Amino acid sequence: MAHSIGNGFPPGVFSQLTRRQLVQNGVFGAGALAVGSLGLPRAARALDEINFWATGTLDIGDDGWRTFAYDSGVKVEFTDNGNDPGPVVAKLAAGNANDIYDVAGLQGGSEKELARRGLIAPWDISQIQNYASVWQWAKDIPYLTHDGKAYGIPTVINADSIIAIRDKAGSVDSYGAIFDPKLKGKTAMEDAWINSVIFTAIYLKNSENAKIAEPGNLTADELGLVMEFLIKHKRDRQFRTFWNGWEQGLQLLANQEVWVMTGWEPIVYAARMRGVDCYYAVPREGYEGWANNTILLKSAVVRGRTKAAHQLVNALFSGFYGCKLGLLRGYVVPTDNNVAYATAHANAFDPAGVRKLADHVKQKFAGKIYWQNTRPDNFQLYETWWQRLRNA
């Protein structure tokens, strides 16, 4: 499973242990609490309240949510769900999450399972006016719909690849560098199958002519091929480690224990702040695309929160949220309303920086993309294989 920084990215935003669980950290631009509206009336009114249970990196902090509420009329009570799809699905199905929360946000792939089990409700796109501004290729993500209905709204989007230290690894343009024997002991991958398996599958499909149809949703045979490849390289001591969590990934680069690794783009910027000359490679095999999607919990419909939930999602695409999230996280909300909002509120946000961040992500998605799927058809087999890798 968030990433390029853009101008004005505050120091300190990288202090937590995991990318998907980063909590608010950083400063809000001067005058931000007084910025203009999102195009909604500002008359005194009772605020609709929504309990938003989402990945920590979607949080814009207390000051951000205050402005969001003032502009949108929706008061957000934000809770970090940890992002791991397994526990999220379990808490919705057998826990009390559906009794507590109204709207959730998590890495895409679980929507169909949740819809089939009756745990989430479809969105009424006609009630989300700003959805028309969402970039078309974000709307085309394959796992957003089920039975012709929209269950996932692509709220944050990016594409991941390889981090390399320039004076150690030279020019890297392929995932093959991770498996290059010349770099033995100086490469690493994340201890998470949702990222490391698809990276390996993308490499084998495009550079080794492996018979793999969809790297994000492997068949049992394809998964076996990929995992045997990884296990062999682990036993050969190709990898320095399989890193776990933000801090370890960053530390490996900062200490130059690792010269090349698959990882999250914000780690590049954090490592640069520590004096490491590293870069995010453009892989010829293609990027791993991912989206963090907003879903409507079934119980919110029962509690009469449907209108407020749609109002929340509409406001997420109105521009302020995208500008604020980009400033805090370097993440992109896939709408040009962000640039329009920054232009109209240049005292709070840098329009050039907002545009630069959007163009950077658009450029990635103009090339070859394979979508991350956190709930592939054989996800339980993925779990089994990954444990074998850990034990190898």
What are these regions (language model features)?
Residues 296-366:
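Mature extracytoplasmic/periplasmic domains
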